[in-house]
Amino acid sequence: MNRQDLAVPLRLLGVSLLVFGLLYQGSLMAIGDAVFPNSSAGSPVYVDGQEQPVGSQMIGQQFRPGQPEDVQYFWSRPSANDYNAMTSASTNWGPTNPLLSERVRADLQNISQYETPDDSVPVNLVSESGSSYDAHISPAAAEYQVLRVANQTGISEQRLNEMIDEATKEPWLGIWGHERVNVLELNLMVRDALNEQNETDQNSDMNASEIANGDH
């Protein structure tokens, strides 16, 4: 094989790397940034004008029963990797796998420690998604948790149901997919409502203190 025989495949390799490795990928990134800037950046969620996002609309976070700090929030689906976006994988345990039965029983026990409308736990609350970091639950799974969240936060059930309606996404084009509730979006609404309650309580305490001191 002479140099001329090698030149053709090497030139083809170089052109392919340039076109498909740089130009094609670069053009897709440029188009994505121009047309879908939020989606191309990972659909980050910002609150209160912070520079750092609190999460992503497309990647779930660990809101789970068994974590005391999450009792006042809506729980997300189980995750095999603690919602680590660097390792997208589920356990793929089959229905006869004893490890799956053990994990589901533990989830059901944690859920049953708090107020529930009935014993029919929605499957979303005890089953992983295929990626193991699904950011959504079904409306039924969210509504099942309203009683607990209302009792833990003091937010009325009516207002919580309104939050669920606001956080519910419809099927794409009304056809593909199912109705789904973004857990992070819903919990940010709960957090805002709790902050409003705290501000109201603080103002009430200040007014009561002023009255007691004879300022009014």
Curated annotation (Swiss-Prot):
One GO CC annotation: plasma membrane
UniProt keyword annotation of Calcium present: no
Q: Where is the composition biased (Polar residues)?
A: 197-207
The record ties this protein, via Pfam families, to: KdpC
Instruction: Cite a single GO MF annotation.
Output: ATP binding
Q: Which residues cross the membrane?
A: 12-32
Q: How does this protein lie in the membrane?
A: Single-pass membrane protein
Record keywords: ATP-binding, Cell membrane, Ion transport, Membrane, Nucleotide-binding, Plasmid, Potassium, Potassium transport, Transmembrane, Transmembrane helix, Transport
The subcellular localization recorded is: Cell membrane
* InterPro entries hit by this protein: KdpC
- UniProt region (Disordered), positions on chain: 197-216
Record bears the keyword Transit peptide = no
Q: What happens when the gene is disrupted?
A: kdpFABCQ and kdpFABC deletion strains are only able to grow in the presence of K(+) concentrations above 60 uM.
Principal location listed in the UniProt entry? membrane
Q: What induces it?
A: Up-regulated in response to K(+) limitation. Induced under desiccating conditions.
> Main role?
Part of the high-affinity ATP-driven potassium transport (or Kdp) system, which catalyzes the hydrolysis of ATP coupled with the electrogenic transport of potassium into the cytoplasm. This subunit acts as a catalytic chaperone that increases the ATP-binding affinity of the ATP-hydrolyzing subunit KdpB by the formation of a transient KdpB/KdpC/ATP ternary complex. The Kdp system is essential for growth under K(+) limitation, and for survival under desiccation and salt crystal inclusion.
Name the protein family: Belongs to the KdpC family.
Quaternary form? The system is composed of three essential subunits: KdpA, KdpB and KdpC. The complex also contains KdpF, a small non-essential subunit.
**Any idea what this protein is called?**
Potassium-transporting ATPase KdpC subunit
